[in-house]
Amino acid sequence: MTYDFDQIIDRCQTESSKWHQYDSDILPLPVADMDFVSPEPVIRALRERVEHGVFGYGTLRPEFYDVLLAHLKTRYNWKISAESIVILPGVIAGFNLACRAMAQSGGGLLQLTPLYPPMLRAPGNVGLQGHQVTLTQQANGHYTIDFDAFEAAIQPHTRVFMLCNPHNPIGRVFQCHELERLADICLQHNLDICADEIHCDILFDHHVHVPIATLDAAVADRTITLMSPSKTYNLAGLHCAFAIIANAALRERFIAQRLDLVHRMVNILGYTAMLAAYRDGQEWLNQVLRYLQANRETVEAYVKSHLPGVIMYAPEGTYLAWLDCRRARIPGGDPHAFFLRQARVALNNGLDFGVDGAGFVRLNFACPKVRLINALDRMRDALQC
């Protein structure tokens, strides 16, 4: 079937976190979910499950593992065992559990910044010391990794590197040679790797996602990979995710940390949606990726032509645009407050992603094009005043 992503869907009365927190005259483009209807096979599967009417405790059918293993093999040529999969209610719970499983209180954790705020908070949540390495921004907005700085930041007590790939908020899809260099440094310094790869299916311009655990067996042995259908198929409110942990001892430590804190099974509707999405959601994904790529190109062209002083490097993955507003001569130097007040457009504050995000905002372009253009027009008009 053909999906209509231009359709305007009113989410205001649906307890949407994105739409509920702002006044009705504000266009919200912050929180990373889509303003699109999810795949029809997912909706159909949920409808059938709801009509059954019984919502007791669930378990995983063998078909689930078959579908998930086939998905990983098809998309990433990644062959794993069913035993390596651990079901979770979300990736945030996953990387907090990974911190507990991989390091003891007082240990160090390494991150590349700017970075998704819950990842920045994770070390403090579990008594670890966070060490941030700033990604290097080129004149055109493109970010690269300073590998010398990365290695120099490793301390004797550092135990974990927390990777975000595709990277939120900058939109980099790290190439194989970059991942190999990071992994080599981690192995040389005896670091485990926690990889948040939740945006792995949202890719543009023939970029290819390489799960870091697929590099070789030694890397896989020290890695916890976290994935979810939530970004890919717009299922964030259903809380369904999974970890892939090849090392049995590490997997047991991870499972032990969730005991009686994080349930071993996702909710029954989340499980139903996840199975249907990975089994039958490919056509929807193909179509939404084309729409998102067009939206990304719209934002890129608009920024260059109509938002003076704003720099955007087109994201290689994710549906998030990281806008550098430091040269836009915004009064007070706070683009988040400025666009909210003057343009009535809500974006993510770059400072939430760390001190490296000062003067930046993050814009979510996973919405109907007419809404996106409306927001950009408002931002243009605010800058011209």
Give residue ranges: language-model regions:
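N-terminal small-domain helix-loop-helix segment of the aminotransferase-like
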Residues: 2-90, 97
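Conserved core segment of the aminotransferase class I/II
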Residues: 44, 221-293, 301-302
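Conserved PLP-anchoring active-site segment centered on the Schiff-base-forming lysine
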Residues: 101-123
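Helix C-cap/helix->beta junction micro-motif
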Residues: 126, 188-189, 219, 343
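Active-site phosphate-binding strand-loop segment of PLP-dependent enzymes
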Residues: 137-207
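Conserved glycine-rich beta-strand-loop-beta hairpin in the small C-terminal domain of fold type I
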Residues: 275, 291-300, 312-325
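PLP-dependent enzyme catalytic core of the Aspartate aminotransferase-like
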Residues: 329-331, 338-347, 353-385
